[in-house]
């Protein structure tokens, strides 16, 4: 193997190196970058590329549906953490045959991924060792190529930050600067913020990189950056015919479906700013997304807080109301009574009241949401009205109660 490795280390061109690996192993090889774009490929027999390989080659990147499946199955996470080659079993639904993959690293950082389709015979232990040793040289070559790309990404991030902080006097000035650094800016956009409630640990940074990879595979128009420990995503579109708001909502749904939030040891709050077609409104959309985050922080969760600022409604006033309540040392005595009763008797009167109010005081949907019988709900509501001075027939009382319930959650 030493002689083979000497040959490997003599290569400085990644295409020639992948050709050599494919020839020696006599198997199809795909090399992708850390953000899953095609860098090089070769097959000892050209017809041996499976459907997944073919899709990657034709589109010059990992297809989104394959990336989503890898996220769901934990393969993306394993690529980031597993140092040695590992097998990925056949997945017929995405046209993927069994293969071995190893991360190509340089100085501990993942530069890309080497995929070897195993076909009829599995790689031997010696071949796996060869692949592992080779991966570091592949990582080194990619690293040298990536330097210029990284500088460009940093310039693009800085441009977006300056736009968010409203440091440009006109859109013409902003577009001129984008053209100078060769950065594509959208025709329409919406700012999405992901906020980790208790800091910005390593897991959150990994999440940011996965989001960046996903968005790059999707459209290469959107931008992902970090501002004050928030993951900030500019969900974008070239065309004013397509709805960015719908794209942002769809992106959040994909995020919740495929990205493993449960592995992040802190709550993640999500905010979506309004859609705009004027680049100087980036800061406004960003501020709107932050308003959603603040509302979720005040209530301690996002159970009832919508992601979209446009749907935030009365929740946008929670921060102002909270500040005024603190100044006046206000406390809703009726809710305090119910809270004390819940703690004393393990009842769920506060939760019952909240769900009842959310359902416009309609018994059937409220009971269904609480998973209790309507008679049980009626009994609880009777308890609440008998214990307190609450008049649920009064609209203003219902509004006040609901706001006070939301603010009570933070305590």
UniProtKB/Swiss-Prot annotation:
The gene is putR. This is Proline-responsive transcriptional activator PutR. Activates transcription of the putBCP operon. Requires proline as a coactivator. Signal peptide: none annotated. Keywords: Activator, DNA-binding, Transcription, Transcription regulation. One of its GO terms (molecular function) is DNA binding. Disruption phenotype: Mutant loses the ability to utilize proline as either sole nitrogen or sole carbon source. One of its GO terms (biological process) is positive regulation of DNA-templated transcription. Belongs to the CdaR family. It comes from the Bacteria.
């Amino acid at each position: 193997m030493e002689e083979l490795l000497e040959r490997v280390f003599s290569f400085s061109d990644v295409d020639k190196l992948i050709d050599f690996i494919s020839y020696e192993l006599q198997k199809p090889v795909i090399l992708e970058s850390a953000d899953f774009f095609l860098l090089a490929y070769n097959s000892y027999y050209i017809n041996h590329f499976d459907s997944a390989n073919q899709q990657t080659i034709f589109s010059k990147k990992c297809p989104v549906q394959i990336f989503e499946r890898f996220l769901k199955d934990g393969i993306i996470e394993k690529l980031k953490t597993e140092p040695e080659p590992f097998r990925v079993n056949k997945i017929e639904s995405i046209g993927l045959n069994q293969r071995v993959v190893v991360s190509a690293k340089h100085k501990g950082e993942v530069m890309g991924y080497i995929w070897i389709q195993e076909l009829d015979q599995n790689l031997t232990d010696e071949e796996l060792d060869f692949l592992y040793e080779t991966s570091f040289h592949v990582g080194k070559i990619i690293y040298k190529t990536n330097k210029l790309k990284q500088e460009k990404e940093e310039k693009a991030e800085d441009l977006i930050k300056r736009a968010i902080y409203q440091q440009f006097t006109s859109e013409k000035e902003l577009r001129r600067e984008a053209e100078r650094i060769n950065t594509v800016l959208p025709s329409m956009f919406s700012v999405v913020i992901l906020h980790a409630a208790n800091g910005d640990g390593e897991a959150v940074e990994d999440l940011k990189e996965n989001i960046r990879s996903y968005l790059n595979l999707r459209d290469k128009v959107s931008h992902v950056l970090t501002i004050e420990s928030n993951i900030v995503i500019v969900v974008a579109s070239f065309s004013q015919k397509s709805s960015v708001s719908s794209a942002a909502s769809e992106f959040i749904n994909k995020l919740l479906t495929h990205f493993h939030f449960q592995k992040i040891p802190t709550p993640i709050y999500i905010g979506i700013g309004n859609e705009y077609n004027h680049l100087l409104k980036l800061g406004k959309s960003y501020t709107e997304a932050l308003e959603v985050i603040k509302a979720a922080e005040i209530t301690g969760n996002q159970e009832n807080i919508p992601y979209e600022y446009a749907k935030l409604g009365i929740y946008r006033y929670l921060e102002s109301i909270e500040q005024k309540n603190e100044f006046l040392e206000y406390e809703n005595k009726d809710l305090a009574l119910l809270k004390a009763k819940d703690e004393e008797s393990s009842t769920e009167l506060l939760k019952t009241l909240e769900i009842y109010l959310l359902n416009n005081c309609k018994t059937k949907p409220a009971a269904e949401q609480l998973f209790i019988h309507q008679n049980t709900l009626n009994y609880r509501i009777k308890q609440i009205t008998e214990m307190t001075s609450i008049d649920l027939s009064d609209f203003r009382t219902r509004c006040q109660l609901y706001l006070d319930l939301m603010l009570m959650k933070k305590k």
